[in-house]
Amino acid sequence: MKIKWPLQLWISLAVFVTIAVGTLLLLQPWQTIKTVTVQSTSIPSEKIERYAGIYPNTPSWKVTGQTQFIAQKIVKHDDKIDTAKVTQEGSHVTIDIAEKVTAGYIQKSKQWYVINRNGIQKKIEIPEGNAPVYTGFNNPADVKTVVSEFVKLELTLRQNISQINFSPNKDNANRLLIIMNDGNTVYATIGTFGKKISYYPGIAAQMPSKGVVDLQFGAYSYAYGTAQANGTKKKADNKAHQKQ
């Protein structure tokens, strides 16, 4: 006697098979991660891979649909990490790490504050000396603007900045006077600080002696003790060249 299966059973079986096949196609358990790219400032890539549990030849199904969870796991592993972002594109995984950065220190009413990468200030006893001291700032928004650009700089450049002083004059109401750890002095402008300070390493490398790097209008340098007229002439020449 031939058994006749109910229509509902066939429909349920078809749905189950469809879901199973769909899951297999989505997870592709036979696929593996081919490459892992880690973007971080100072934390070694090997550490980040270990925190994430992702390496070349890791099964793709361990990553697919779990990138947010993996990112949270990375942050919990290391106090130096501010945020993490994990992106999967086929067999390639990219992990972007934003490390916690001490953007500097500022003193107000004899109280010291540490400034984080978001410009938030927190009371401390005394600066640790691992980031620049901000002085002369009266507008908190100006501090945040400078901080937002400072934290984007290369680590070696950040480590070379000792002090960032708000030092306006009649020619530049937003002038910054920056003291470098290598012995040079930099003049810059709040609005263009982040973009122009990146030129500093190349300019400093060509200076025959310690001196001033002026990034307010163009970019030029002169040695300490050089007549200010020479510096002014160079600045004027630079402006004229830019207008050509």
UniProtKB/Swiss-Prot annotation:
Stretches that traverse the bilayer: 7-27
Sequence ranges on the Extracellular membrane side: 28-244
Chief place where the protein resides: membrane
InterPro entries referenced in this protein's UniProt entry, alphabetically: Cell_div_FtsQ/DivIB_C, DivIB, FtsQ_DivIB, POTRA
Side of membrane Cytoplasmic, spans: 1-6
Membrane topology: Single-pass type II membrane protein
All copies of domain POTRA, residue ranges: 28-104
Key words of the record: Cell cycle, Cell division, Cell membrane, Membrane, Transmembrane, Transmembrane helix
Location of the protein in the cell: Cell membrane
BP-aspect Gene Ontology terms: FtsZ-dependent cytokinesis
UniProt keyword Transmembrane, yes or no: yes
Pfam families: FtsQ_DivIB_C
Gene3D superfamilies in UniProt: 3.40.50.10960
GO cellular component, one term: cell division site
Domain of life: Bacteria
Biological function: Cell division protein that may be involved in stabilizing or promoting the assembly of the division complex.
Family: Belongs to the FtsQ/DivIB family. DivIB subfamily.
Name this protein carries in UniProt: Cell division protein DivIB
Gene: divIB
